[in-house]
Amino acid sequence: MSEQSICQARAAVMVYDDANKKWVPAGGSTGFSRVHIYHHTGNNTFRVVGRKIQDHQVVINCAIPKGLKYNQATQTFHQWRDARQVYGLNFGSKEDANVFASAMMHALEVLNSQEAAQSKVTATQDSTNLRCIFCGPTLPRQNSQLPAQVQNGPSQEELEIQRRQLQEQQRQKELERERMERERLERERLERERLERERLEQEQLERQRQEREHVERLERERLERLERERQERERERLEQLEREQVEWERERRMSNAAPSSDSSLSSAPLPEYSSCQPPSAPPPSYAKVISAPVSDATPDYAVVTALPPTSTPPTPPLRHAATRFATSLGSAFHPVLPHYATVPRPLNKNSRPSSPVNTPSSQPPAAKSCAWPTSNFSPLPPSPPIMISSPPGKATGPRPVLPVCVSSPVPQMPPSPTAPNGSLDSVTYPVSPPPTSGPAAPPPPPPPPPPPPPPPLPPPPLPPLASLSHCGSQASPPPGTPLASTPSSKPSVLPSPSAGAPASAETPLNPELGDSSASEPGLQAASQPAESPTPQGLVLGPPAPPPPPPLPSGPAYASALPPPPGPPPPPPLPSTGPPPPPPPPPPLPNQAPPPPPPPPAPPLPASGIFSGSTSEDNRPLTGLAAAIAGAKLRKVSRVEDGSFPGGGNTGSVSLASSKADAGRGNGPLPLGGSGLMEEMSALLARRRRIAEKGSTIETEQKEDRNEDAEPITAKAPSTSTPEPTRKPWERTNTMNGSKSPVISRPKSTPSSQPSANGVQTEGLDYDRLKQDILDEMRKELAKLKEELIDAIRQELSKSNTA
């Protein structure tokens, strides 16, 4: 065959569908084809043949007639038409389009060279200027053979040379295209490899990060676990140390209390009360107040001595509070502690010596716990004097003889000769043993009591013993009253004068005592063995009436003194407290009815106790000294005692002695209510003075408002304050010493309101005083507001003029 390919290009062959007016792929399937232009050298004709690259399907086979209109619509899409249809080639690249267009132009030139050279140029220009689908007449198909010799055209050799050059160029372009294809594939492969490598690296980094986070989390959990274990060990160690400290404290207290307990177990029979008289005339003693049915057997007291294992020592904050009060007041009395000085703790808690004398089965209160509440202490008439010696080096002044009301379960301990430094640190208690089922031998004959003070005297300040304030909750009789004592539900305590106590022996003590009096010296005072004669004038009193059961921490109810006909039953207690003890039995048939109660005994001056000059004559002087000493304590801060209204009186007896505690325990209430009137007049005078100062400078007005706030807060205490020199801040500490000093209005209860001559004085002029004070405050505030507005206006006017 004499046909040769003069051109090769890669293009998608398309045909135009006249029915649908769109281009469709030739052969029915899309894809690139190899399109060739073949030149038949024998008859000098050209045709276009295209085959699919994939399956070599022939998609175009058409002849190139002379005068063909070849249209290059775009750089990569060329088109032409023949008699049957319109063809289009969508080339793969610009190079393929240029090569195919050059070969097509060459073929058209060869075909047109048979006519004239001018027609060749015209055909080339027409083909380049054609921009649309053929709009000229359809060219006839050339089937005739061209003549062998072409007139006025290139020779056959020239055409062969041109054809070979075109083929060479085509081969070079094909090689270049294949090289570029290989490079492109290589680039794509490298790109894929790079992406894969980056993905693997990213995954590896992610795994490493997760592993690192896991390791860090495990390490953090391990550290947290170690920290928790360390904290747990530290907490266990601290708890162990605290337990050891508590055990050590308990063992030390038990070991300190053991000698006293042992001495009480082996105590001799009760000594004669005649040997226990104070050096001079002491306060009225309970010489006749003894238990009617009592056994002279000593083991009775030993049985009562044994305490149950439930007795718990007070907490250390109580000791700190008592030490703070004792140090700040500088009292001449060393604090005698209620929790330590009263009941010794036996070393062996299970040891309870057997008693040869049958004790009554109705004595469960004697075995109760010794952890007494703070409201356990209320006023009581004087009880037998007992000498309480302070530890050496702690008491700064002469030691007074303090009357103490002691519970019946507490044994009487003889003095001890083993006190260090020659001073005795033990406390001797008079005991009222529990009644037995049958008659017993009478106790030793008591000494004749000193005559009571004359009743017409105004009641002097209460005795300086807080236990006096509460031992009468069972309607205990006054001094010299014959009365049989019964066992109480709770042992009494020996309070400390330091809990809000005065600074000298002349100052009246607080009749109510809180837990703040529990300090370390009292522990030493209760723990010393007592077996020898009492040194330093230790005085032992006869048995005192039993104390009442502990009251709740609400209002502390004190007992009312019994009327002349007989002792009334104890007052009703709040539902939160333990049941009251049985009332004291009536007077014995062989004794006269109790006389009217005398006024309470005055505070014992230290000099009078030790020099033997205490008598009935100097009691008014003692009350004056107490008032002077009370004036020195104006700035002493006090713990809130609003829950102790009226000092705790519960009786409705209108005797003068029952009013001695009406003023919050600050002192006796003067007869006739003169103290109340003086207090009200002083309050009104101070308010008038404040009102006169109201027109001064602004700072003074603020101070006046602060002073006005004081009467508002302390109105209720001032209405019941018995002494005209008392101020609202002068109340002694009657509750827990660890609380902050707060002044509050007492709660008015029918059983505890103070009275003067039988008239209730709680809310006498309260509303009028309140209204006057509020009016004064409004006036002062209005003045202050006007002055402030004037000052601001002056400043603004000055700034405007400037």
From Swiss-Prot:
Residues 1-111 form the WH1 domain. One of its GO terms (biological process) is actin filament organization. Pfam families: VASP_tetra (PF08776), WH1 (PF00568). Residues 664-675 have a biased composition (Gly residues). Residues 431-464, 542-553, 561-605 have a biased composition (Pro residues). Residues 143-155, 348-361, 525-535, 731-760 have a biased composition (Polar residues). Belongs to the Ena/VASP family. PANTHER family: PROTEIN ENABLED HOMOLOG (PTHR11202:SF1), SPROUTY-RELATED, EVH1 DOMAIN-CONTAINING PROTEIN FAMILY MEMBER (PTHR11202). This is Protein enabled homolog. The lineage of its organism: Eukaryota, Metazoa, Chordata, Craniata, Vertebrata.
